[in-house]
A protein has these predicted regions:
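PLP-dependent amino-acid enzyme catalytic core
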Residues: 1-243
Length: 243
């Protein structure tokens, strides 16, 4: 897969926002995004800069809430990771947030480099000007484990849909911020079958894998070993490309 800090992945994620907004008639829309590494929601800010009528971008986090704390207090401080049922948010350094900081600081690369050095020592304070810029771009909210489980149950009861725990975090935070007359879109970031234990804990149902994925377990495995060497890897890629 492509790691979430990879720019190609961020570019691909911009499409979500255009598709969702177009389906709602290109009117002003709010988005709530389950957020760990900040890539998905950063893609939303790019979509807005491209002219999409996104009104609010809302960061949704679990108890590992460094982003929520940064946006509300201006302090970006590394804490202790608390394991949760939404593990993609179980981080303390959000790699794509550096990109948002770069824009908030007006593209001052030296300032961002200094902040990243301070982060290695435990954290830093965001300047007032940059913090104001970030707050104009993003809102945030956090939910607990109990609230996440409760939201999975609620959505199952209300709609019949089964959410993964990350998506449930997003919906829970979205409901804290929804306003009458403004569409609210929450990004569903994973299939519930990816987190069967958490879903079963919430609703007593173990979600099955989609048929096209379940069938993969019955197929033969093929493994190609390659030396830990750039040239060897390049040669293999070129060889496979021509087959």
């Amino acid at each position: 897969g492509v790691n979430s800090i990879n720019w190609a992945r961020v570019v691909a994620q911009i499409v979500y926002y255009f598709t969702a907004t177009a389906s709602l008639g290109m009117r002003e829309t709010d988005f709530t995004v389950p957020t760990g590494n900040f890539g998905d929601i950063f893609a939303g800010s790019i979509a807005r800069a491209m002219g999409l009528p996104i009104r609010r971008l809302i960061v949704a986090t679990n108890q590992n809430d460094i982003l929520h704390r940064a946006l509300t207090t201006g302090e970006y401080r590394v804490g202790t990771v608390e394991p949760s049922i939404s593990p993609s948010m179980d981080i303390q350094v959000s790699s794509n947030f550096e990109r948002a900081l770069y824009l908030a600081y007006g593209g001052e690369a030296a300032a961002i480099s200094q902040l990243m050095d301070e982060l290695k020592a435990g954290g830093f304070t965001i300047s007032q000007g940059a913090l104001q810029t970030l707050r104009e771009q993003y809102l945030s909210g956090r939910v607990s484990e109990e609230e996440t489980v409760a939201m999975i149950r609620t959505i199952r009861a209300e709609t019949g849909e089964v959410l993964c725990p990350h998506s449930a975090v997003g919906v829970a935070v979205a409901r804290q911020h929804v306003e009458p007359g403004v569409p609210m879109v929450t990004l569903a970031t994973a299939h519930p079958a990816k987190f069967p234990d958490a879903v079963e804990q919430a609703i007593g149902l173990r979600p099955p894998l989609p048929p096209h994925m379940a069938a993969l377990f019955d197929l033969p495995e093929r493994v190609t070993r390659v030396e830990n060497d750039n040239e060897a890897l390049k040669s293999l890629i070129l060889e496979r490309r021509t087959q």
